[in-house]
Each structure stands twice: as C-alpha cells, then as structure tokens.
Amino acid sequence: MEQYKHDFIEFALSRNVLKFGEFTLKSGRKSPYFFNAGLFNTGRDLAKLGEFYAQAIQASGLNFDVLFGPAYKGIPIATTVAVALVNQFDVDKPCCFNRKEAKDHGEGGNLIGSPLKGRILLVDDVITAGTAIRESMEIINANQAELAGVLIALNRKEKGKGELSAIQEVERDYGCQVFSIIDFDDLIQFIEKSEQYAPYLASMRAYREQYGV
C-alpha cells in the first residue's frame, strides 16, 4: 500500500471519520465500518484532506482541465484540492461547482467559478447510489465538456442492488474511470498489520465475502 493511503486511513481514524464496529447503513445492511467525510470540517482537516486528494490525482496520472465539485459536499473538496495541487505540485487547475437551484439574478446560471470546458475531473467524498454523478453528467454534457474521471475518498467496493457496485455502474454508463484515495481492500490490508484493529479483521473479511465486488 502506498504511504499516502496508509496515512489517509490513520488520518480518517484520528478524526472519527472512519470507525470500525457494528453499524446499520441506510440500505439496511449491517456494516463492520462506517465512513463519514462530513467530519472533516475544520480548516486543518480540509487542508490535509486536499493534500490526500492531490496525491491520489498525481498517482493516477490523469490528464484533466477543470476540477468540478457537485453541490453540496463536493464544493469544499474541489476548492481544497485545487489549493493543494498548487501548494504540493505547482499544478494550477481551475475549479467549478454547481448550485442546486439556478439563480435569476447576479452571477447567472447554475455554475460558480471556472467555465466548465474540456476534460473534467469530478471530486466527491463517496459514491453510494451514483445520483450526484448522474446529475453532474447533465451539467457537463450541457456545457459540451467531457468527464475525464471521478475521484472519491473511499471506494467501498460492494454490490448495489444488483451484482455491480454503484461505482462499476458509473464506469459502465459514462465510460470514465472512477478512482479513490483508498478502497475496501486497503482497509483490510491496514487492519492486517494493526494490533489495535485486528479484532475487526474477521468481520471485515466476512463483509467482503458477502457484499464485495
């Protein structure tokens, strides 16, 4: 596992964004872990979060023109990632996000920031049902831009209602690559080398066996 992935897991644990235990998800599934990126909510947390996204972007080698953060959770992510790319790698990319409702006065339309053109990298926290991606695709298509890729914090790598995960459905439907800072397999790898979290290894493996893709 790359060092930045290991560091991100430790960071998420330290902020209680990632927890191991027994949790009931909205879907009704019993999960041995829970991930809530909304708890990255201080200036220091967001600055650090942006650095991890920036490292994942550099590791991916993806070529893109504009960062896009879907409202609402993607907005602070796109902003902090744009800053981190400049500070860490001297890569200066424009960023853009959407309003949920279009304004009829002031700065018009439903987009704020850079024009949405060229190859777009969409950044968000997780993909659960893919709804935000589908809504974003309408905006990207309306601006004659192209979705180059999607970057999220965590890929749960689990089945949706069918055999595919929500991420696999997005990749299939839009022909783009979805990549993540960490995925479920990274969590298991982390636990395998951790005395503190070793008690959760069996339940994590069982969950992967039942729901993994």
From Swiss-Prot:
SUPFAM superfamilies: PRTase-like
InterPro entries (UniProt xref): OPRT (IPR023031), Or_phspho_trans_dom (IPR004467), PRibTrfase_dom (IPR000836), PRTase-like (IPR029057)
The protein's annotated pathway: Pyrimidine metabolism; UMP biosynthesis via de novo pathway; UMP from orotate: step 1/2
Binding site for orotate: F34, F35, T128, R156
CDD domains: PRTases_typeI
Pfam short name (any one): Pribosyltran
Keyword Translocase among UniProt keywords: no
Positions annotated to bind 5-phospho-alpha-D-ribose 1-diphosphate: 26, 72-73, 99-100, 103, 105, 124-132
PROSITE patterns linked to this entry: PUR_PYR_PR_TRANSFER
Signal peptide location: none
Cofactor: Mg(2+)
Gene3D superfamilies documented for this protein: 3.40.50.2020
One GO BP annotation of this record: 'de novo' UMP biosynthetic process
Catalysed reaction equations from the record: orotidine 5'-phosphate + diphosphate = orotate + 5-phospho-alpha-D-ribose 1-diphosphate
MF-aspect GO terms: magnesium ion binding; orotate phosphoribosyltransferase activity
Subunit-level organization: Homodimer.
Family per record: Belongs to the purine/pyrimidine phosphoribosyltransferase family. PyrE subfamily.
Function: Catalyzes the transfer of a ribosyl phosphate group from 5-phosphoribose 1-diphosphate to orotate, leading to the formation of orotidine monophosphate (OMP).
PANTHER family: OROTATE PHOSPHORIBOSYLTRANSFERASE 1-RELATED
Protein name as annotated: Orotate phosphoribosyltransferase
